[in-house]
Amino acid sequence: MVQSELQLQPRAGGRAEAASWGDRGNDKGGFGNPDMPSVSPGPQRPPKLSSLAYDSPPDYLQTVSHPEAYRVLFDYQPEAPDELTLRRGDVVKVLSKTTEDKGWWEGECQGRRGVFPDNFVLPPPPIKKLVPRKVVSRQSAPIKEPKKLMPKTSLPTVKKLATAATGPSKAKTSRTPSRDSQKLTSRDSGPNGGFQSGGSCPPGRKRSKTQTPQQRSVSSQEEEHSSPAKAPSVKRTPMLDKTTTPERPPAPENAPGSKKIPVPDKVPSPEKTLTLGDKASIPGNSTSGKIPGPDIVPTPERMVTPEDKASIPENSIPEEALTVDKPSTPERLSSVEEASGPEVPPMDKVPDPKMAPLGDEAPTREKVLTPELSEEEVSTRDDTQFHHFSSEEALQKVKSFVAKEAPSSQEKAHTPEAPPLQPPSSEKCLGEMKCPLVRGDSSPHQAELKSGPASRPALEKPHPQAEATTLLEEAPSKEERTPEEEASPNEERLLRGEVLPKEGVASKGEVLPKEGVASKGEVLPKEGVASKEVLPKGGVASKEEVLPKEGVASKEEMLPKEGVASKEEVTLKEEVAPKEEVPPIDTAFAQKTHPIKPSPDSQETLTLPSLLPQNYTENKNEGVDVTSLRGEVESLRRALELMGVQLERKLTDIWEELKSEKEQRQRLEVQVMQGTQKSQTPRIIHAQTQTY
């Protein structure tokens, strides 16, 4: 603004100077030009001055191209004929500031012209000048403002676009170790990419493929840290292959993955899509966790990841996948269920994603741990896919797998199982935190995650309905828990205890001890108790046991599961009994050990999925809703009570104030009455005296 004003003055001066002072300045007065307004105030004065003193405007007149008005501060009496008389308050128009004597200006006041001392006047900002300057400033200001506004308006749009692009991508880019890289990929994919991952399996896979390598690298590092002995790293490689290729058949482990890919095709629904994503990612469940993880995995899952890292990157990733699913509640439940399902096998994923997550992690670990497990899972996955077609066949296959790999799976399951427990806890929090509904669904996941075994049982629980038949049939034998099964759980415990320590999954280790505790270990702690625990699970107790894994919400959720899971409970008792007895880890691990029993269960679950998701979720949701509603009701009651108390206090205060005011009014009235009476009495007396 200042610059523009400064520039305008010289321009005006130049124009005035260029114009002949006599004519041109007066005629045009600068009004024709937008910049001239500053000169317009006194266009005629300069010409008069020039005519009186000079033929052409001298250079020093440039400083005063137009008369400036100064206010007189002090009176001045002229001592010479050419001096100007000044009176305080008068306005002097300065015609020239350059005269023969320094400190003297030439000006005009009240129609007289002369010189006067410059220290007798104060230059108030001339009104005439100010008006043009303001106009100019307004003109220039709008020009500048639009420029400023334009970038502002454009910036918000850009920011919004960036946020829009990054926001969806972030939400869908499961915050994984490589969040930045994922964000970049997600940005490229844009919100569409995020929706693709959630909505359609193939696009989701593509995205996850791009991101999974990063996650896998992180997860592979985690696995290496957790236990080099674990095959997870090896498994990861196949998983990477799987992630790189939607059809993960390339590797034997990928074969299950490839089957899972078909499942994605089969499963267009969000849950199935998730399942597909999970299965695709679950070629090694860890892969599914990783693949979905990148897209879906939320930060909470990441939190679980540390545990998972300790246990197995894969586990954490599966959990992440679950978590990812959780972020999108609708798909989350399904995806979580699916994720868990994959643990048991792909079947579990689809049928019982909720339960599967834990199972998934455990199986994933097992897969990572042993190719056999992966093969079993592959077959299991195939069974799972087929399970929709025939759960019995899947169960048989699973049983055969379990029988074959019971020892190896037990060992491996122990390792994977331990990790699942930690993830479960974190997931449990995440699931519960994220949403009651998810909680209901996730609680099973959480329970499963909390304790691999628990998760297994949870998976089995999802299976329960399908398993109910098979498990019920197998329940007696399983509940009997042949010495072999019990021994295997014990062995599994030992292995888990050993592997878990390796995994450094203290949480799992804890669970292992819990195995004694079996987070549910409450009963699970001992396999001997496991049968009891399983029975409780079959009953509500088993649920509660699982609930411990999940937490309270998980218990409630598990209870619904158990309601459904009673079958699973039987199976769990049968399969999980040893596994749960082992502890959550044992269960997950046992499931892997009996991997397949759980897998069969999970396969059954595939059939159950529809039942489980509804009944199971409904039960969980009901339990969660009831507890949450109770809490809300209590909080509301408290709030109402507080409000009532506060209102009462306020009312009492108001009443007191009213009473005090009434009393004051009465007093004032009394005083007024008394005063009036007193005043009247003297008047009467005075009147009487006057009359006399």
UniProtKB/Swiss-Prot annotation:
Compositionally biased tracts (Polar residues): 210-220, 673-692
Pfam family, one: SH3_2
Family annotation (Gene3D superfamilies): SH3 Domains
SMART domains to which the protein is assigned, alphabetical: SH3
Official protein name in the record: SH3 domain-containing protein 21
Record keywords, A-Z: Coiled coil, SH3 domain
SUPFAM superfamilies: SH3-domain
Coiled coil: 628-678
Hydrolase in keyword set: no
Signal peptide: none
Biased composition (Basic and acidic residues): 177-186, 378-396, 490-501, 542-582
Location of the SH3 domain: 65-126
Species of provenance: Macaca fascicularis
Record-linked PANTHER family: JAK PATHWAY SIGNAL TRANSDUCTION ADAPTOR MOLECULE (PTHR45929:SF3)
Region feature Disordered, mapped onto this chain: 1-60, 132-501, 536-605, 672-692
